[in-house]
């Protein structure tokens, strides 16, 4: 018997030894589902499967044919607004990228990205090598523009994180001019532009803006050596290269040159209709310690250049290079940044001859550690200004150091903005942990600010059309609505026995709210949740609130949340079906329900099960096609697609 027992134990140990040990090499290979994208017509789903460390894969799935294709190392997927083309880049192998970074080699030692363009009808794939970046209009059919790598110029850059956004490349002041190729994918028409450093489509795909830069003249190596030996005269102005800003009409590829000067121009911005255009730029010397920036505005009827000499510009303030201009949705207002003129650094001081101190006072707004952390951000701080495009030569400063931020209202269409200031509570927040804020209605024509709310410890939500400011006060746990026209405030949950703050909060602080889910059309009402259910509060203050899930959530211990399935739709239709994410607190099941706000009945269950899913639901813009993930503690997240949530 002892012999048999020993033999049995040896067998167990042998098989146990065959198991692969759990180390970095194992969990580096673990995979997870990444972001998902559905074509507007719902016929195509793109999703990523990412490795913890290594090369991920992109999958393109046909919801019609139930087939899919795999593309290793793909990223930056875009499905054109007409749902006819898929565009993405393919990166070098992860091991090659890592080797370049580990060895601190220059980027030109690495294979460049490739661009793939797939015709979704024919499955024809066009591959373009050595692509630095690409863009396609969000709502403009089948156009694509891509900037090729400048392989003639050797890079002097350190290796960068390839996952960073391409927008940083667009504003890279050291970018080398290269070839920009624009293609109308629907017709095959192609146009190339040389020496391009920046480019941008209008949202509707009707216009393309790009900036060209005159390349540096090639110098004889002998002359370069002589220049190295000469002492550099930093006082002598060094001019920028000659740049030109151009607009391309994408119907006929006609070019309109707007600017041609020695300078640096960036932040190319169109309005929604592509009939107005703005950008920032400087024509100061490249080695000036303080540069003067201009805001350029162009339209069919009027052009304007704004700078520190413009009417109504605050004294000793300038146009900010650190805030991109932004048109209102209706194109009648243009928001941009202004800032106090920077003080030039004294380059004559010798650092070793002067003490460098960090001095802190108990009266400072922030702890010194916070000040140092935010130093670069504070040096680039911009304040908001606006101009009316009917009179673009006049600006109105909206924010300033005592009211240092604003929120634009109704996508910028409103004649006023929401001013926000935390100046009065900054020092206090060092020990309370919460910043109380004051709120103002700021007139976009005059800049006059009228305070309507003081010392709010909570959060404020402007309604989509700007008729109301709904806010939650953490200190009393109540919801309020401020009527902008009537200048009156109403407590929304007055008289309700339901608690709208965290019922299980057990810390010595004020509890947070469960959240505001959104507004209904025309600023009619607001949807706010308690622990389980959703409530509709009518902003006119005359109608009693309704529990739109009819108490079903609290009765069954199911918590409901809404979805935002279309970013272009900013409010709920009270009579349309809306989908709700559901989570059962008792058995931990999750699922999806549907209801209508106007009916206030028990929501209809579509699916509920022993999994966690539906939290990250995405929808096709023009079709009833949905994608979601489901997972359990035993099964990793899987991707599903459905048109009714009953079959998948």
PLM region spans:
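An N-terminal hydrophobic leader/cap segment in hydrolases
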Residues: 633-648
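Beta-propeller folds
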Residues: 6, 15-625, 631-637
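Sec-dependent N-terminal signal peptides
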Residues: 2-11
